[in-house]
């Protein structure tokens, strides 16, 4: 970020949060629009819920050997990214609250460094989320259209290498973000990466579902076991499509905010949109909360494992859940 962008970004957070502490609807002096008051407790609550949910997802994948497949390894990577963005948003909210209430007094330069770290964590999480979604999409593509060769193409070692590569790349992006935080080109690269990755994912899914239509008759002609595997693969593709849709809806306002801040910071309508920055952070955290619910809604194996972890850890004798056919 350049200095003016960075200071406006930080001041917007501070002003919005300060308004939340004094009342629900406080007009920002630098904006003609009223800020939507969001209590600090909302950020903390969503952060805790997201953290617990995604820990549950990771625990379920580790616990259940039936979930030890490349797709669920990539889902685990996505859950880590969701945890990271929720934790960074929650910690940033706590820091702003402490600064506004004079419980924490530190130099402005150090505040900027802290803000850079939080922004870097958000940068890492969004890149990791996009890369994990792309990896899941490619996995589903291979599962559907190269079913017989799937286990030779997507091995556990190869999926582990992909995940390691994703997080190495994301960590590198985070380091670059901190080192060149004064440059608007960093933000421009992040925005470009988001829309390019989104275009790539949407194109892949359109291609996937168009090809899937031609496979419907083939699936009907397959033996029962093969047909069931193909339908399961298609269900997995639908699940990832839901994840992509939620990701787009929840993250798009944030990136539109960044785009407007670079392109028209003085425009009246742009200022109105940017005055609701905290709402866009809430949407990002909602994405982290909703992803585990989608896993549970779409996967019977996940639901069963969630029940075992939640209910049967301390009450193994009392809790017993019949298996569904």
Swiss-Prot record:
MF (Gene Ontology): melanocortin receptor activity
GO annotations of cellular component type: cytoplasm; plasma membrane
Lipidation positions, renumbered (S-palmitoyl cysteine): 311-312
Entry membrane topology: Multi-pass membrane protein
CDD domains reported for this sequence: 7tmA_MC5R
TM helices/strands, residue ranges: 38-61, 74-97, 115-138, 156-179, 187-211, 240-265, 274-297
Similarity field: Belongs to the G-protein coupled receptor 1 family.
Pfam families tied to this protein: 7tm_1
Glycosylation sites: 2, 15, 20, 28
InterPro entries, alphabetized: GPCR_Rhodpsn, GPCR_Rhodpsn_7TM, MC3-5R, Melancort_rcpt_5, Melcrt_ACTH_rcpt
SMART domains: 7TM_GPCR_Srsx (SM01381)
Protein task: Receptor for MSH (alpha, beta and gamma) and ACTH. The activity of this receptor is mediated by G proteins which activate adenylate cyclase. This receptor is a possible mediator of the immunomodulation properties of melanocortins.
Keywords: Cell membrane, G-protein coupled receptor, Glycoprotein, Lipoprotein, Membrane, Palmitate, Receptor, Transducer, Transmembrane, Transmembrane helix
A GO biological process held by the record: regulation of metabolic process
Extracellular side: 1-37, 98-114, 180-186, 266-273
SUPFAM superfamilies: Family A G protein-coupled receptor-like
Listed name of the protein: Melanocortin receptor 5
Organism superkingdom: Eukaryota
Record's subcellular location: Cell membrane
Residue ranges, Cytoplasmic side: 62-73, 139-155, 212-239, 298-325
